[in-house]
Amino acid sequence: MSKRRQERMSVEIMRVLSQIIQEEIKDPRIEFKNLSITRIDLSNDYSHARVNISILGDEIQREEAMKALQKAKGYIRSALAQQLKVRHAPELEFRLDRSIEHGIRISSLLEEIKEEAKGSNE
């Protein structure tokens, strides 16, 4: 499979998954405004897709949202196959992506250092 085709398929899977989660999943533990699909890693044969998800909120909210996604995984996969018009949708593996959380933490630490440096110069 060409890398270009694989990338296009990953982008399309991300778009469709976002739509399914936002519009079709009715589990109250999943709030789409707090959930973002950050990346899709698709296997060369399209049989597996690692779905990296960022969830804003505390640890309990993240765990509950991940449990809800795991529970709905079968439905999400069949809806994905229907919308992509493929016979076999990839097996989905949801993973929590903490990169946004780490970025926010780093930004706040840099801001603290900047404020301390400003205070010591005065």
Curated annotation (Swiss-Prot):
Pfam families: RBFA. GO terms for biological process: maturation of SSU-rRNA. The keyword Repeat does not apply. Gene3D superfamilies: 3.30.300.20. One of its GO terms (cellular component) is cytosol. Keywords: Cytoplasm, Ribosome biogenesis. GO terms for molecular function: ribosomal small subunit binding. PROSITE patterns: RBFA. It is found in: Cytoplasm. Monomer. Binds 30S ribosomal subunits, but not 50S ribosomal subunits or 70S ribosomes. Belongs to the RbfA family. One of several proteins that assist in the late maturation steps of the functional core of the 30S ribosomal subunit. Associates with free 30S ribosomal subunits (but not with 30S subunits that are part of 70S ribosomes or polysomes). Required for efficient processing of 16S rRNA. May interact with the 5'-terminal helix region of 16S rRNA. This is Ribosome-binding factor A. The gene is rbfA.
